[in-house]
Amino acid sequence: MSEFLPQRDWTVIVGSGMAGLMAAMTLAPQPVLLVTRGALGGETSSAWAQGGIAASLGPDDRAALHVADTLAAGDGLCDEDMVVGIVSSAPAVIDALERAGVRFDRDAGGNYVFGLEAAHSRRRILHAEGDGSGAAIVRALTDAVRRTPSITVLEGTEVRRLLTEDSVIAGLACAGPNGSFLLPASQVILATGGLGGLYDATTNPSGNFGQGIMLAARAGAILADMEFVQFHPTALSSPRRPLALVSEAVRGEGALLLNENGERFMAAVPGAELASRDIVARAIDREILRGGQVFLDARQALGSGFASRFPSIDLLCREAGIDPARELVPVRPAVHYHMGGVATDNKGRSSVRGLWVAGETACTGLHGANRLASNSLLEAAAMGMRAAQDIAGRPAPAARSAAAVSPNATADFSPADLAAVRPIVSRHLGIVRHAAGLAEAIRDLLPLAERNGPASDPAVVALSIAVFAALRRESRGAHFRDDFSQKDAKAMRRRLSLNDVVTVAHEFSSSSLATAGFARSA
């Protein structure tokens, strides 16, 4: 390492999506250092979100209905207390966002305009600037952060490791434009987003491989429910990477899914085009595996009104040479969200002292086995705020000097390289899984994860998904195994440390998946 950044009594926030930005704003006027890999708010899934924020604020809606929809989508694995708490926090979240400068869409009478998305029983999705909601929200929050004197922003800086002393957070090993440095810190909030970049077909920023999960796991944090990876049913099918998302709000306005014969294949399924994402994604995947294409037909439902209702999607379609008002839109599933992550409590605390985690990096139990549409931005904002409030209510930690950082922290860490990992993950950890594929994934990923090379960090995250998936010998929510296609009578969440993951991986590598019996449950 080339230098130490001087010690300050600030809280360090890693990541500048919704969770990180809301945590920073909530902590003000306490000092915050916000560290972000790119530009503030840039290259974040939050900024790319076309959907809005689910909030049961409509005249025909109430929190209990939103809770019921969330529990149904989660397929038996939701933490009901977390669901009730986060859903009930929606009014406070919306108020905080509006005070920060977000302007949600309203009608001529000044009332909120609510959209409908899959598996919601009511129109309860709030948008800002239509299908550009994520960009509008993040833009308002980044402006607010830059206006706040207590927040220092460090852009273009990647955190390579969390440093601990006696299992307590002591600092961060970072790499920036001027080289590597150590950043002493005793309070860290990880909010680095998801892991879609592990897959070839994703709607996430391609560089997002689960950095926060890796950092926390290497620091000793417990992981939860890592097998649950959500595939959005309708990404625009094209050579573009990452794939462009076609929000399910389009289906909420009446667009239909057709196979290449022009047949509506979702009509007989409960919920039809607005069934939960796992069901729709598997149905589309089956059609594609039969050798066909799948199309979204918005011609009758929206027609010439498509561009005004969904300007961002209209532009993406036209860039691909498609006029969605007059033509069918080819779609395919793509990785969109990860329900698992670093296990946290209702205040965002991880199992490592001094480490809080919020947003998609965390696993709170809100989503269970399958996320309900537009609950992610709600959770990110709510848990960013909760983590900040928990830190703000604590006594100031004792200052740690650079000398307190462990001696092995002076080693440089290689930047991540996904080239060796992405093909394995895309082939074996997709929409449909089975024992042989999971065994091959574990066999190929384990040596990569145990080495110190550039593939090691993404391989740690990918191996965790594979091990959790191999241990779950049932199909539930977004996790589907064609060799265990039924759901167990008893729902069980699972929590493992990285040491547990590696131990299980070695067991699987030396024995049959069918007889391996290691399982640590929540």
Curated annotation (Swiss-Prot):
Pathway: Cofactor biosynthesis; NAD(+) biosynthesis; iminoaspartate from L-aspartate (oxidase route): step 1/1
GO molecular function, one term: L-aspartate oxidase activity
Cofactor needs: FAD
Reaction it catalyzes: L-aspartate + O2 = iminosuccinate + H2O2
Site residues, Important in orienting the L-aspartate substrate: 117
Residues at the active site: 277
Keyword annotations: Cytoplasm, FAD, Flavoprotein, Nucleotide-binding, Oxidoreductase, Pyridine nucleotide biosynthesis
Broad enzyme group: oxidoreductase
Alphabetical list of Gene3D superfamilies matching this protein: FAD/NAD(P)-binding domain, Fumarate reductase/succinate dehydrogenase flavoprotein-like, C-terminal domain, Succinate dehydrogenase/fumarate reductase flavoprotein, catalytic domain
GO-annotated cellular components: cytoplasm
EC number: 1.4.3.16
GO biological process: 'de novo' NAD biosynthetic process from L-aspartate
Record carries keyword Oxidoreductase: yes
A Pfam family the protein falls into: Succ_DH_flav_C
NCBIfam families registered for this protein in UniProt: nadB, PRK07512.1
Family: Belongs to the FAD-dependent oxidoreductase 2 family. NadB subfamily.
Protein name per Swiss-Prot or TrEMBL: L-aspartate oxidase
Organism: Agrobacterium fabrum (strain C58 / ATCC 33970)
Gene name, Swiss-Prot/TrEMBL: nadB
